Amino acid sequence: MVLIFGGAYQGKLTWAVQQYGLCADELCDLAHGFLPGKRCYYHLEALTRAAEEPVSPSLFPADAVLIAREVGSGVVPVDAADRAWRERHGALLRQLAGQARTVVRIFCGLPQTLKS
């Protein structure tokens, strides 16, 4: 598994497509729902926002490329539902990072490998 994360509009998907040679039919935009059997899943934050319970890392294939937005950056949301989502999303990212063979942070389109 590969985990790619970073802020909004930092070039995460573009970098992943180039780095891993991904085609459009291998991508699943989780903002529009989950499709099994894809090679790359992006917008993990949309999946954790829609879920009422924690998302299990086992939902994704072991060789998947997963792309997630950093949320919060230390800012605590005023709304309780937003705080709960931020906590669910952060917990999922910690679990995925622990299981992933590679973890990359993208900032301004530049990759920073945290784990390989």
Label the predicted regions.
Residues 32, 41-43, 89:
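Histidine (H) residue identity feature
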Residues 32-36, 111-114:
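A short acidic, often aromatic-flanked loop/helix-cap motif at beta-alpha or helix-coil junctions
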Residues 36-50, 66-68:
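Conserved P-loop NTPase "ATPase switch" module shared by AAA+ and STAND
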Residues 1-30:
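Glycine-rich P-loop/Walker A and Walker A-like loops and their local beta1-loop-alpha1 context
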Residues 31, 45, 107-109:
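Residues at the C-termini of beta-strands that transition into short coil/loop
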Residues 21-22, 33-39, 58-62:
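Flexible, charged surface loops at secondary-structure boundaries
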